């Protein structure tokens, strides 16, 4: 690889192992780093061994030293860090940051120097705890919000799928992910629009009994029933089988049930490759022809009506489709002479926009021309937003009164084009 060119990193953090892929624009597809030269051994166990003399070992090298008395062995690093979200200790937070840093440094095997343009981390479920942990990792590694992004398995599956040839996604696309005793099913549905094709993912999850996991014939029978249930009433072009659970030659009846009119692929590294595609794709300003919608995406646009140079206009507070946990812009605005805020809500998939009128009360006691507010829309999730206004003072002439107004706004509200007025005074606790 040419070290002078931009490169992108995709990291798959599973429950007990990680994988990493590198991608450059002159490559046909991302390349997954193997832990053994000449072999497709991609999984890196999420374990560490901290030797007392200061040396740290990761993955398989740590497992070799697990029983040695000259250090400490740590396993389940990702799960341990997630559990620390509600505890006082942060030991596993530090270990997880160290592990991710080590993964990124594997780029040096390919002669790549400097920081990647973007790192994308994909995890099974992007829960509140996972979001907080990954934000902590980003801060500790000194990456910006654009330089380290994160997503769940459904989105990385989407990113991998729609970077393949079109014949593979003419209809729905399915993925079975089987790791340990956890079996998951993802089904991508695509809806063509005028400019962008909208994609959503249906999900199902099972905990496979240990007595079945260890018996090939029972597993084949169990999985055959899962396939029947999952494929019912769906036209599917392609099926991916991902994870260690599909090792061994036990897929017999299951493949018969799947049918012969679908393409099938068996592998381990689809999700890390999808993350690498995402690191590259989401770093580009140009619009892609596909949009993935899920519960952690903002479900609409939120615009604030303003007056500028005698004409009405709008400024964008919330962008539809952005992750709800991403930073939103803030603006400083002068008071326009009327205690009314007008918002326009445009929901994804809705034909018409809605207008919401909000009325301010208890304005600061000073001339209207000296009223200036800082305004920002702060998401709570993909559909709920808090519109926050604070008195910004007016330079050296008037200090801020400290007053704050907060307006709850629902992006999924139903109703007509104009909503009823709501009156809001300063937030409780404001002066």
Regions found by a protein language model. Name each.
Residues 1-8, 145-174, 270-293, 366-367:
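Conserved phosphate-binding catalytic cores of ATP/NTP-utilizing and phosphoryl-transfer enzymes
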Residues 11-17, 167-184, 189-190, 243-246, ...:
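A short acidic Gly-Thr/Ser loop motif
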Residues 119-131, 228-256, 263:
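Glycine-rich phosphate-binding loops at beta-strand->alpha-helix junctions
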Residues 121, 129, 136-222:
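Small-residue (GG/TT-enriched) beta-loop-alpha framework at ligand/catalytic clefts
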């Amino acid at each position: 690889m040419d070290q002078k060119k931009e490169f992108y990193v995709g990291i798959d953090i599973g429950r007990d192992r990680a994988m990493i892929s590198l991608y450059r624009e002159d490559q046909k597809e991302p390349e997954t780093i193997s832990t053994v030269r000449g072999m497709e051994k991609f999984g890196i166990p999420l374990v560490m061994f901290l030797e007392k003399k200061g040396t740290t070992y990761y993955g398989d090298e740590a497992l070799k030293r697990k029983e040695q008395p000259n250090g400490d062995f740590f396993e389940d690093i990702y799960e341990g860090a997630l559990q620390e979200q509600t505890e006082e200790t942060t030991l596993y937070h530090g270990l997880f940051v160290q592990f991710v840093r080590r993964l990124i440094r594997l780029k040096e095997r390919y002669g790549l120097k400097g920081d990647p343009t973007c790192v994308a981390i994909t995890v099974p479920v992007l829960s509140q705890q996972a979001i907080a942990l990954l934000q902590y990792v980003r801060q500790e590694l000194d990456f910006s919000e654009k330089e380290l992004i994160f997503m769940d398995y459904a989105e990385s599956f989407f990113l991998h799928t729609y970077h393949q040839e079109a014949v593979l996604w003419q209809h729905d696309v399915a993925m079975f992910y089987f790791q340990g005793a956890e079996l998951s099913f993802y089904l991508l549905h695509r809806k063509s629009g005028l400019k962008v094709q909208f994609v959503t993912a249906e999900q199902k999850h099972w905990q496979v009994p240990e007595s079945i996991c260890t018996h090939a014939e029972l597993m084949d029978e169990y999985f055959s029933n899962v396939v029947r249930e999952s494929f019912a009433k769906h036209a599917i072009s392609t099926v991916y089988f991902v994870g260690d659970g599909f090792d061994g030659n036990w897929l017999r009846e299951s493949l018969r049930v799947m049918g012969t009119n679908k393409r099938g692929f068996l592998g381990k590294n689809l999700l890390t490759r999808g993350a690498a595609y995402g690191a590259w794709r989401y770093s580009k300003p140009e619009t892609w022809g596909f949009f993935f919608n899920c519960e952690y995406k903002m479900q609409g646009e939120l615009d604030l009506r303003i007056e500028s140079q005698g004409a009405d206009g709008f400024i964008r507070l919330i962008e539809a489709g952005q992750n709800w946990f991403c930073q939103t812009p803030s603006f400083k605005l002068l008071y326009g002479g009327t205690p009314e805020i007008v918002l326009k809500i445009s929901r994804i998939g809705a034909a018409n926009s809605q207008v919401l009128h909000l009325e301010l009360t208890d304005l600061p006691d000073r001339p209207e021309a000296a009223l200036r507010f800082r305004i920002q829309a702060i998401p709570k999730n993909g559909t709920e937003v808090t519109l926050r206004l604070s008195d910004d003072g007016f330079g050296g002439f008037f200090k801020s009164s400290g007053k704050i107004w907060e307006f709850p706004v629902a992006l999924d509200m139903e109703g007509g084009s104009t909503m009823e007025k709501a009156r809001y005074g300063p937030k409780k606790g404001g002066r």
